[in-house]
Amino acid sequence: MLVLRSAALFVVAALFEIGGAWLVWQGVREQRGWLWAAGGVLALGAYGFVATFQPDAHFGRILAAYGGIFVTGSILWGVVADGYRPDRWDIAGALVCLAGMALIMWAPRNGG
């Protein structure tokens, strides 16, 4: 159950962080307006709170593991939101990142 909770929190964090960054990008770079950018700033702020709900108490471990989700989520966001087409190296790299995330978060440990 803790693995499912942790994975769900990583997905929520990715939606806030990647979505927030995308909104800032759209607002500034694509000139959609400052309301888009402001929405992005709010989403990025919300992202900062999500990690505090992770069951593991080690900040460094949580953020390091989240990196794998961020990489994979960013590629997926690009596919859905921008029509990006990842190549085999993008996919292989994302899979390596996910394997690293799983190892960091859920490898058996003796007391910590």
Curated annotation (Swiss-Prot):
It is found in: Cell membrane. Its main location: membrane. GO terms for cellular component: plasma membrane. InterPro entries: UPF0060. Keywords: Cell membrane, Membrane, Transmembrane, Transmembrane helix. Signal peptide: none annotated. It is a multi-pass membrane protein. It comes from the Bacteria. The chain crosses the membrane at residues 8-28, 33-53, 62-82, 88-108. PANTHER family: UPF0060 MEMBRANE PROTEIN YNFA (PTHR36116:SF1). Belongs to the UPF0060 family. This is UPF0060 membrane protein SCO3297. It comes from Streptomyces coelicolor (strain ATCC BAA-471 / A3(2) / M145). The lineage of its organism: Bacteria, Bacillati, Actinomycetota, Actinomycetes, Kitasatosporales.
